[in-house]
């Protein structure tokens, strides 16, 4: 496990399934009170086509609920398509030995899946959301809508959950602000709160620092460290600094394939990152965060 090679198939680490390895690590860290982790994602021999082009090839990936994982790779490597395959926005090509299970199921209604998996896109909100108050934008997460339409029935519990999610993101002060008047960093906090209203066991973050200035990036990363105490983090990024100290596993992608999957300390090296991004990389680590130049 953790070897970069041309075939695109990551070697498997000894010691059982990924879920079993995570349980072993939790026990070694002294966590014996938490309930056993459940399987979240299982992919075997997954190919995904967009139009006539196959953009994901032979993907093998297993993630346990509550696990913290970073998917790292250059732009155009297939990360966005992998997200769509995980969130059931697109489905794999059916073939021999192919398997794609989310919580043990092949197919999901997207609104039902959002109760278990919170998804935060790299893009800022669509045209309707900027004319929505912060609290209403968060509540709209219950309906997977761009805003709160008049026909939607909002309960007191939904409002309570929305306030709770804003508080988790240290964004309660944004409840009465128009989303369109917020900074990029403030908007990202509201959108993550929107994904948290269901109290999902897993949170998928696509390029979380996209469009944020340095101060907003730092604030968001520290807030997400708190979220990581109660939910698994699946982070898709090409920025090393996005990888929180709580994330111990890294999956590397290149040219539509997983080329390495292993412990963060084994994969975040200058040699491996230089191979992955095709450019000479110099690394430094500070307070659990890695930076490159």
Predicted regions and their residues:
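A short, proline-enriched helix->beta-strand linker immediately N-terminal to the Walker B motif
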Residues: 197-201
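Conserved ABC ATPase "signature" region
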Residues: 139, 154-174
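Helix-to-loop junction immediately C-terminal to a conserved catalytic motif
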Residues: 87
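ABC ATPase nucleotide-binding domains
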Residues: 271-293
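Conserved ABC ATPase signature
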Residues: 151-153, 178-182
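Catalytic Walker B motif of ABC-type/P-loop ATPase nucleotide-binding domains
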Residues: 203-207
């Amino acid at each position: 496990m953790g070897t970069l090679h041309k075939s695109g198939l990551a070697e498997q680490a000894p010691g059982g399934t990924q879920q079993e390895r995570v349980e072993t690590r939790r026990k070694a860290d002294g966590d014996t009170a938490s309930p056993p982790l459940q399987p979240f994602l299982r992919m075997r021999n997954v190919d995904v086509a967009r139009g006539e082009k196959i953009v994901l090839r032979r993907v093998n990936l297993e993630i346990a609920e509550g696990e913290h994982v970073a998917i790292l790779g250059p732009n155009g490597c297939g990360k966005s398509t992998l997200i769509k395959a995980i969130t059931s926005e697109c489905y794999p090509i059916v073939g021999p030995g192919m398997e794609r299970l989310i919580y043990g199921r092949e197919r999901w209604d997207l609104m039902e899946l959002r109760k278990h998996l919170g998804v935060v896109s790299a893009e800022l909100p669509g045209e309707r959301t900027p004319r929505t108050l912060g609290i209403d934008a968060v509540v709209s997460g219950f309906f997977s809508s761009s805003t709160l339409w008049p026909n939607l029935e909002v309960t007191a519990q939904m409002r309570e959950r929305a306030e709770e999610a804003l508080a988790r993101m240290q964004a309660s002060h944004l409840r009465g602000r128009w989303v369109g008047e917020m900074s990029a960093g403030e908007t990202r906090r509201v959108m993550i709160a929107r994904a948290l209203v269901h109290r999902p066991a897993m949170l998928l973050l696509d390029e979380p620092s996209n469009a944020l200035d340095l101060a907003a990036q730092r604030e968001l990363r520290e807030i997400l460290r708190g979220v990581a105490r109660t939910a698994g983090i699946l982070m898709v990024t090409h920025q090393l600094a996005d990888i929180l100290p709580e994330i111990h596993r890294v999956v590397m992608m290149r040219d539509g394939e997983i080329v390495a999957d292993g412990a963060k300390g084994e994969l975040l090296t200058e040699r491996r990152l230089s191979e992955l991004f095709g450019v000479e990389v110099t690394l430094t680590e500070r307070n659990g965060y890695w930076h490159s130049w």
